[in-house]
Amino acid sequence: MDRRLLLSALLFIALACSSNRVHGALNRHSFPEGFLFGTGTSAYQYEGAVDKRGQNIWDTFSRIPGKIADGSNADIANDFYHRYKEDLNLITAMNMDSFRFSIAWSRILPNGTISGGINKEGVEFYNSLINEVIAKGLKPFVTIFHFDTPQALEDKYGGFLSENIVKDYVDYADLCFSLFGDRVKLWNTFNEPTIFCMNGYATGIMAPGRCSPYASASCAAGGDSGREPYVAGHHLLVAHAEAVRLYRARYRAAHGGEVGITQVSHWFEPYDAGSAADRRARRRALDFMLGWFMHPVAHGEYPPAMRRLVGGRLPAFTAEQSEMLRGSFDFIGLNYYTSNYAVAAPPPNKLHPSYLTDNWVNATGYRNSIPIGPPAYTPIFFNYPPGLRELLLYVKRRYNNPTIYITENGTDEANNSTIPISEALKDETRIGFHYKHLQFVHKAIQEGVKVKGYFTWTFMDCFEFGDGFKDRFGLIYVDRATLARFRKKSSYWFADFLRR
């Protein structure tokens, strides 16, 4: 027997035997009928096969020395492009209901536009993937854009800094709806626009790597940290609204699907609960992180705090755009990883404006040197399950109780090549993380929040953008040298938790 197969078989036996339910009575049947349990991926982080698509901004960014923590790239990634059929078997083995993945814009349209040509091989790949997902008894949950702007459009007009992106994105979304919408019933226009705009245009630590010189000397692409994040976000919101309007007019009646947008937010607690200034800071922190993209799709305008503090650097919606944005979702995706304390900050330096300081808030994970929750491997993340319930209740109150899918929740550990794989698979911390968060999701549902699903991040260890492969979020371990897959203990725990 192949040594890797033998090792995998032995690990299967050991971990399966130790995967008995280690927590209380909560399980799949505790949640409402039809509740979706799933796991997620994204195209650039998983697919590989870079030679079979057009270039995107991450292909360019990852080749700039120093931009990726471990110097890696995602040319091969997890080679999901060639291994998806066997990989989907791992998802069904965990008794999941749904698989969340994204379509690579440049794999469908290598030059970013319809006129630039459609890649038939790319279309065939996604058709085959969707068909296989359904054949496995899984519901496809598809993201149209997950940070990977075609490089051709970045070169042509600056990507999301130009209003030209709106038409090209809507054309691309239209093509996706027409090609795959007969089988895909859950569409997500954009993933985490806050992260895309903040780190792509304010800090420069993610593609396209733009920021002001005073924000970072390493932003060789140039930029304006006080203006460009808002410009890119504005065009993204208009593109989202146009795509939703098109779907509702052209496809919804025939396909019967739904379209949403995935937001991301920390929960924030006031550093000093007795301080009115810190309580106001908590509200501003939520407005700038969640409200930036949630308020427009719910109310047709930016949060009042953003309009007041950002002023003329924040673009204004036309009356038509505002009307189009208002209610432009059937559901909200919500990604949650951590909570912070919000501390009222003094007015920022007017000569150095930045999205990062416009909210007049200092966020920290520590109060009196005590963390808000156990720190994860990624230093900005803290394990604080009550924060997810608080965030869900906040969205319910502030935004008229929308339908919510928790589209990402997860924790990581270091990619430590010095320990045996058999030890790396023992991820008890991840089991406790998900169980405790699911307890608070269950509680929020009992309190009237319309949560319809919970997706782990991530299905298997993958390229984590600026961190490269140095951390592992997956339920499945990937050996970077061989790309062999090994089930972690958490994957067996989910199989037990989700037993039908």
Swiss-Prot record:
* Entry's EC annotation: 3.2.1.21
GO BP annotations of the record are: carbohydrate metabolic process
InterPro entries listed in its UniProt record = Glyco_hydro_1, Glyco_hydro_1_N_CS, Glycoside_hydrolase_SF
Q: What is the residue range of the signal peptide feature? A: 1-24
Pfam families linked to this entry: Glyco_hydro_1 (PF00232)
| Entry-linked PROSITE patterns | GLYCOSYL_HYDROL_F1_2
Disulfide bond positions: C211-C219
- Entry-listed glycosylation sites: N111, N362, N409, N415, N416
Q: Report if keyword Glycoprotein is assigned.
A: yes
Enzymatic class: hydrolase
Record: active site: E192 (proton donor), E408 (nucleophile)
- The record lists a beta-D-glucoside as bound by Q45, H146, N191, E192, Y337, E408, W457, E464, F465, F473
Would you tell me the protein name for this molecule? Beta-glucosidase 28
The organism of origin for this protein: Oryza sativa subsp. japonica (Rice)
Gene for this chain? BGLU28
